[in-house]
Structures are given as structure tokens and as C-alpha cells.
Amino acid sequence: MTADDGVPIYYTDRGEGDPIFLIHGWTMNHKFFQHNIPELSRTHRVVTMDIRGHGRSGKQELNMSLRQAAKDARAVIEHLSLDRVTIAGWSMGTSLIFHYFDLFGGERLKGAVFIDMTPRLVNDGGWEHGVFGTLDYAAAYALERDIFEDRLTVEEALIPACFKDGEAPDEETVEWWIGESMLTPTGVMAAFWTSMVAHDWREQLPRTPVPVLLCYGARSALYPTELGALLDERIPQSELVVFEESGHSPFWEEPEKFNREIARFAG
């Protein structure tokens, strides 16, 4: 599929039934849902999309923002004539969903799934639920600089943080994750980091237009605070499911439980 600005957008479409639309995280791609698509597609129609600049989508570095990515997601939904979609976003994928709500409300959606993500990445005196519970604007800008100066070192630090207690399960998994992540151009990585840092969606939470399933890891290194419980309080139609043996990636760390919960929620 081609987006409205000419950038090719890669998607997959498998199974039949009520649609589930899986959106990956920062620098990742649809392959990260390899433990979920086969099982979920037994009972649902499962769609994935590689966000522009990621995976097999176009790398033109044109309009590399989450707002445009949300428009791309809407275009995929329209292209496939989907309705009553359960849209699930992991990490940055949840940020994309916030932009979707801002642009389109709950149009074409039945529900949403937030997977271990914050409405505001940066911490300050009044907010401790951002990245690591400590990342401030100075650190956010420093990370953008480091992405350009020594990207591999950044990847080697961030990838283990995606697992429980900040410890990757094995070297082979880390190598695969880094290899797939490095397919995203460095300029794209930096652009989407800036796009995430620039937005604060806390005020939108009480106006969330659809029911939300909150999937949060009890042992998340990226979000070590009680973020899931906080969002459960602020989002009117929400349900919190805590993954006791997961960090930032419950769909990978506890796939059977994740698949069961998201299938139940999607109906």
C-alpha cells in the first residue's frame, strides 16, 4: 500500500473474524509479533503494519512523525475495509494510537490495547512515570545526540531494557532484536524519538474514546513505577492486566497469556 505522500507502507493480513491491528514499537517491525500472529489469527483477523521508515516500509525519511504514522494506520484500515478494530500498540505503537485518537477519535475502532507505554516520556518534578522514572529533557536530548554519534552502543543498552528487570533472556535473542532494529535508518530512529518526546497525552486520558486494555509488565525496567495502575484510574473504560513475569515486552515474554487476554478483549 502507498501512503498519501507516496511512501510505501508494508502490512500483513492473516485470519478471519473481528480485526486486531498490531502496531510495533520504536525501530522495530511486525516480526516482533511472531509469537502472537499465528495464535491470534486462529480466531481473529490479524493485521500488522511496519511504521514508515521501519521494517519493510519505505525508508525515504519523508514525514517521519507519529502523526503521519497514525494517518498511515488509518489508511491501512480503510484499504482493508476494516471496522470495529481492536488496535494494539506496543511502546511507541501506543503513542501512535494517541495520535490516532487526536485525529480520528474512535472512528473504525472497537477498542485499544496499550502495551507498557507512558503518555509522557519525560520526567519532571510533577511526573515520575516517564522513561526509567528518571529521564529528563537534558537526558532525552543527549540520547538523540548519542543515536547519531554511536548508535550501536545505544541499541546495546536499550534492547536488554525491553525485558524483565532489564536483563535479556539470551545472547541470540539480543542479537536478533538488535539486527532487526538496525534495519531502521538512524535518521528515522532520531526523528521518531523526537516525535515521542514532544508530546504529552495526559490530558487526553479521561477523553479516551474507546475501551482500553492496559497490558503492563510488573518487572518493566523502562517503566518501573505503578504506571499501569495510574492509567487505569485516569482512563474511564479501562482494564488493567499485569504481567508478573514480564518487563516492557509482555507479548514476547508471556505470549500465551498475552494472546489469551487480547483475544478475550477483542471479542
Residues covered by each model-derived region:
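Alpha/beta-hydrolase fold catalytic core
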Residues: 1-21, 42-45, 82-83, 110, ...
